[in-house]
Amino acid sequence: MLSGYQPRPARHRGVRCTRWRFERLVRHACETLPTRFQKLLRNVAIVVEDLPSRVVRLEGGALGLYEGTPIGQRGTDYSMVLPDKISIYRLPLLRACHTQRELREEVRLTVLHEIGHYFGISDEELPF
């Protein structure tokens, strides 16, 4: 070994997961919700995207994003609006995880976190 030489630590590249399997993980997280919550999510588009937009990335690395008006903030004039949308970002989640088990759990927590925002729960109030 050369004097002063420090080997680079192995670079973590995340876990591998096909888009199809990742979408199944997201769908499974939604399907395991109690039925009463699933019914409330019927008009919410839950989508998988590879990466967040540049604007979202600049605001702080995101694993998911809720876009819409939380249920509790909708007034009587709430109509003629696009459906709410929850985006789950595949590549950041893959990079953040070391194992398939960890990926399943992080996908589940991210889905629950964004659904929490749909129900009007702030980041500070969410336990995850």
Whereabouts are the PLM-identified features?
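Active-site rim/adjacent substrate-binding subdomains
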Residues: M1-E106, Y118, E124-F128
